[in-house]
UniProtKB/Swiss-Prot annotation:
Compartments reported by the entry: Virion; Host cytoplasm
Subunit annotation: Homomultimer.
The keyword S-adenosyl-L-methionine appears for this protein: no
Organism phylogeny: Viruses, Duplodnaviria, Heunggongvirae, Uroviricota, Caudoviricetes
Biological role stated in the UniProt entry: Assembles to form an icosahedral capsid with a T=7 symmetry. The icosahedral capsid is about 60 nm in diameter and composed of 415 major capsid proteins. The assembly is primed by the interaction between capsid assembly protease and portal dodecamer, and major capsid proteins assemble cooperatively to form the procapsid with the help of capsid scaffolding protein. Major capsid protein forms hexons and pentons of the icosahedron. Viral genomic DNA is packaged into the procapsid through the portal vertex. The packaging triggers a dramatic reconfiguration of the capsid shell.
Keyword Coiled coil applies: yes
Name of this chain's protein: Major capsid protein
HAMAP family, alphabetized: CAPSID_LAMBDA (MF_04133)
Originating species: Enterobacteria phage phi80
Annotated coiled-coil segments of the chain: 109-129
GO cellular component: host cell cytoplasm; viral capsid
Amino acid sequence: MSVYTTAQLLAVNEKKFKFDPLFLRIFFRETYPFSTEKVYLSQIPGLVNMALYVSPIVSGKVIRSRGGSTSEFTPGYVKPKHEVNPLMMTLRLPDEDPQNVADPVYRRRRIILQNMKDEELAIAQVEEKQAVSAVLSGKYTMTGEAFEPVEVDMGRSAGNNIVQAGAAAWSTRDKETYDPTDDIEAYALNARGVVNIIVFDPKGWALFRSFKAVEKKLDTRRGSNSELETAVKDLGMAVSYKGMFGDVAIVVYSGQYVENDVKKNYLPDLTMVLGNTQARGLRTYGCILDADAQREGIDASTRYPKNWVQLGDPVREFTMIQSAPLMLLPDPDAFVSVKLA
């Protein structure tokens, strides 16, 4: 038995629970929900012969010999779920005024909304993890509810994943005399288009700015109204805009996700990503596999939130948000990923 309507839940979820991860925000700006379980790449406007190479993962190992190229794919299904615990309605909420105690009805609403916030965040973290992995390596492992893990490979050229080593490692260079500009320009040649942004993790940024030449060339002045600088400024606690290095914006990303109750960084230590804010990243979604959604005429959607009461002894109440996300890069060579050393 439904409690809140889907329209109410969608409105609350959209207005109150914005999640603004960097890679999704600036590199994946097109959204394509499908009314079918599969995502059909041929139906996305402007794509020409895009295909994914999908390989099964057995015992943690990618078996490419059992994989194949496909232009249609069923995304993993995610549906974080919480119970609305009646005991929590008898307890004072953390921010509740002891002199003005709220009634259980108000507490129940607050608990439902907090559950939804947690569920939305869980899905958004999956989306950002896919987006970051697509940019870093051109592939990622797809997992989901009742879904055997597979590797989704978008076909990144080997030359676009660079590992510094030996004499080329920045850590071995003289910080007073060496200028890393030539290295960056050489790396950028591997990108399919023009590079207008570089994203570092905090340790990669610390290594880059340790060069005196960088200190001299980095323009940290504010006040530009350019579309690029507007796009990368003021994105929250996890993102720091450092300035312009020539005509390239420098951004440091310290975003994290939670896996098995452990916080992990989206970007590995000593990472540098060269890209363009006009790169065409796609947020695609398979249909919602829920009978209630079908009855309501909701199939092609990025989310399906629901709140319902399950009859029985005792009666139980739940919240859940469902989604089938698949983040894609039609041109994975628009980016160059560098492992600094």
